[in-house]
């Protein structure tokens, strides 16, 4: 996914090839954007009681129902 396409509040799904097995295929909500357009990590929340994770746009894709 391109950094420019990521919107706060959108649902995303972590890619199957993600480095941490426990996050692969998980669905979360983009809560925050950091950095600038050339170096932008996103804070993604995966549940009410789960800690938020910093991910790059290349590590997830938009999730559609």
Residue ranges of each PLM-predicted region?
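Basic/aromatic-rich interaction segments and small domains that mediate binding to polyanionic partners
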Residues: 3-64
